[in-house]
Amino acid sequence: MSRVCQLTGKKANNAYAISHSHRRTKRLQNVNLQEKRIWWPEGNRFVKLRLSTKAIKTLQKKGLSAYARELGIDLKRL
């Protein structure tokens, strides 16, 4: 499974690791992904999602149905 947030689509970012002598080597900045089981009241069931921590904070504020509707995601397919 790829390291991508299922709601926001966030994925790894290319960056440089810079040493003391300022030599640069490429590295990845991965997304902080968490596996979450979230209650979906309209579907009357739990939905298991792989989410970034920013998406989890937004879910707590807006709610699952409103946030998925805003992003254009069909929860019935998950």
From Swiss-Prot:
Listed InterPro entries: Ribosomal_bL28, Ribosomal_bL28/bL31-like_sf, Ribosomal_bL28_bact-type, Ribosomal_bL28_sf
Keyword entries, A-Z: Ribonucleoprotein, Ribosomal protein
GO biological process, one term: translation
Domain of life the protein comes from: Bacteria
GO CC term, one of those recorded: ribosome
GO MF entry, a single one: structural constituent of ribosome
PANTHER family in alphabetical order: 39S RIBOSOMAL PROTEIN L28, MITOCHONDRIAL, LARGE RIBOSOMAL SUBUNIT PROTEIN BL28M
Family: Belongs to the bacterial ribosomal protein bL28 family.
NCBIfam families: L28
Protein known as: Large ribosomal subunit protein bL28
Organism, as annotated: Synechococcus elongatus (strain ATCC 33912 / PCC 7942 / FACHB-805) (Anacystis nidulans R2)
Gene name in the database record: rpmB
